[in-house]
Amino acid sequence: MAQNLDAQYNAAVERFRSEEFPMIRVDSIYLDHAGTTLCPKSLLEAFARDMAGNLYGNPHSASNSSQLSTSRIEDIRLQALQLFGASPDEFDLVFVANATAGIKLVSESLRARDGGFGFLYHQASHTSLVGVREEAQSSICLSEDETEELLAGSTTSLDLVTRSPPGAVLLAYTAQSNFDGRRYPLTWADKVRRAHASGCTPICTLLDAASFVSTSPLHLGESKAAPDFTVLSFYKIFGFPDLGALIVRKQAWHLFESRKYFGGGTVDMVVNFKESWHAPKNGFLHERLEDGTLPIHNILALGSAIKIHQGLFGPMRTVSSHATFLAQEMITNLQNLHHSNGEKVCTLYSPYPKPNVDGNGWNQGPIIAFNICTSNGSWVSLGEFEKLASLRDINIRTGSLCNPGGIAIALALEPWEMKRNFSAGLRCGADNDMALGKPTGVIRASLGAMSTTSDVDRFVAFIVEFFCDDGAASRDLQTPRVQPSLASGEAELCVDSLTIYPIKSCAGYSIPHGKQWQVRPEGLAWDREWCLLHRGSGQALSQKRYPKMALIKPVVDLESGRLAVGYLGEPIPYLPERVSVPLSHDPSVFRPSTYVSAAPSRVCGDQVATKIYHDDELNEFFSKAIGVPCVLARFPPGSQHGDAQRSSKARLQKHQITTDQESDVQEVHPGSGTTTDSTWGNDKSQNILLSNESPILLINLASVDALNQEIKSRKGSSAVRIPTSAFRANVVLRRTDESRPDGAQGLPYAEERWRGLTIGNQTYTMLGACRRCQMVCVDQVTGCRGDEPFSTLSKTRRFDGKVFFGVHMAWGPGSPSNNVVAARGDVAYPTIEVGERVLVHV
């Protein structure tokens, strides 16, 4: 019966989803409803009609428009209370920005009481709840057992936060973990109130219902059994508006009496000349706490949101049943995935949803936290998972999910481990998410009212396609450790092409045939010396987020001594045909250094002291071209000093180690964030400019050809050849004699086993394989994004959970054959040229 009802619900959503939620494209999957759910088009249309058809004024005035606003706001306040089963006779609702703002309002009010307050919080609390401990006189994080003891009447935890008697004790907990979806009894507030009714210090309760109410009905009922404070965010239920609520039991109103601050609209009278005196409003609690003008339009939109949501999806209990059914399906399907050797693909941290013992609701919400393992038992990097998910337009959350207790318990992370990881540079959202082979975050799939069985099926199919080893072709390749057969120094390759990318992540400039190009320790001359910085954040822009950057074409004009830049996209009104800047380090074209230091730039996670151009017309050219407010900045050679210095991140990978190299590889001490590194080559770290990882990136045409053959074998006639430009390499090598049988250098991917190269008369050291992301899928001619070649690379070139193609290398004056000539005090660096012969050192 339940399945039939859900089938009806699912069919109804399928019928109207394309019309109501056009932002979910046919190939998209949205699985981040715990972050925010999606807003139906009819809600936006209803809100627009309301705004266009009615005149709403500031509620603090007495005009007709103001009175209309006041009347509507109070009606919607009542609707919101009724939505959560809260009688206006026993509760008041305070509009706030979001759940976090409600939590902060409570904590600041309790802090102002004589003696402050003690704080007890459950281990599954969101970071916004944990942060309250900084406002408290003392605080304790409660485990499951300690919480049960407190509810049973134990004063052990209570005594620890009341040694210096506080004005109150606050117990905070979540109705549903935003980490793994576990639900906690809504009866805790009543239980703790009854168990400690005779105590000297009153215990008040704060319920974080933000995650819970997104897909489940909340009925606060009688105030004597309800939490003193309940916080939530409406956008998690309706997608729009961006608004939150703090619902307060009237018996707890007195806890706000010590609050100091007052804003406009919350007082009846203020004296500030000769005397300081004010009279707070003494009616409803919300009149004293809603400082300043309310977010009028957000509140008005809430009225439409409640009506539209109920019209589309019915009562919340129906939404809850549907979302729970989908969660059961996803958990079952993920649990049943196995590699060909029998090992499980997924490690799940969320339990299978079951009805509560009392028959009221479920013990688990529609949130599934998990990680993925390879067939050999190693963890799949969250960064690699996100790259593939982004490629398939799967919108999902990864990381520690703003839940420190949940992540620590699920991954068995001790405090010392988390501190060590932080010291090693690991951050939530950073690309490096493994510490000594152990994950530091999880994947979270969360479902909502407009999710369907198709979303679940297609997501599971995605996991199978990219992460399930069926035995036919291993998803995580283990390259044999073999000794290359050809002797070192045999010539068979030459330089096919040379390309530099003067502006990071923009189009490349091909070095003409016959042109000798200078090579420096930081890389090829003029390569990635400039970048575009976001005006607001100072973050360097990249094609990964802004693919139109591929259409910005720089040209190095050595005769005029300038870098000329044009735009190859569709014509943009009033956009100059081209702009240019001097190649010389002319200080007059940059903003003063004091201006730069106030807003440091960030490139690939590094803080960099770039020099920003002050020409407004120049910066406007780039802003218009890619549609993002940005400025042009430069990080020329010689800028690397102190904290601004950038070093190569490239290193030898496990799959590159041949038999005779094993003794050259050593383990790195714990805390470094890596597991192995190379010790051969230059013993000094290589300085780099604005490249991601190394001074020079090299690819082999034999490898590009092999990859294209693989794509063709998988996609047949629909396959489109991937050009070398997709990989944005500086140096492309090719065979000099195509008629010869394949030798070691002619084999695809043989470059990953080379120790070094001699090009012309200069020696280069190989630093390690190049880790790839979905940016290789951006067409460098059109700026459009596809799914190849990363889709095929992830299935054929994945090692240790990471995808590689091409190799990093560096030239350095430390090699015996590399002579740097000093002439008249200037350094004369060597050159490289298209067509030069290449000797391989294996």
From Swiss-Prot:
InterPro entries: Aminotrans_V_dom, MoCF_Sase_C, MoCo_sulfurase, MOCOS_middle, PyrdxlP-dep_Trfase, PyrdxlP-dep_Trfase_major. It comes from the Eukaryota. SUPFAM superfamilies: MOSC N-terminal domain-like, PLP-dependent transferases. Residues 637-680 are annotated as: Disordered. Its EC number is 2.8.1.9. GO terms for biological process: Mo-molybdopterin cofactor biosynthetic process. Pathway: Cofactor biosynthesis; molybdopterin biosynthesis. The keyword Methyltransferase does not apply. One of its GO terms (molecular function) is molybdenum ion binding. Residues 663-831 form the MOSC domain. Its cofactor is pyridoxal 5'-phosphate. The active site is at C402. The modification N6-(pyridoxal phosphate)lysine is found at K236. It catalyses: Mo-molybdopterin + L-cysteine + AH2 = thio-Mo-molybdopterin + L-alanine + A + H2O. Keywords: Molybdenum cofactor biosynthesis, Pyridoxal phosphate, Transferase. PANTHER family: MITOCHONDRIAL AMIDOXIME REDUCING COMPONENT 1 (PTHR14237:SF19), MOLYBDOPTERIN COFACTOR SULFURASE MOSC (PTHR14237). Sulfurates the molybdenum cofactor. Sulfation of molybdenum is essential for xanthine dehydrogenase (XDH) and aldehyde oxidase (ADO) enzymes in which molybdenum cofactor is liganded by 1 oxygen and 1 sulfur atom in active form. Belongs to the class-V pyridoxal-phosphate-dependent aminotransferase family. MOCOS subfamily. This is Molybdenum cofactor sulfurase.
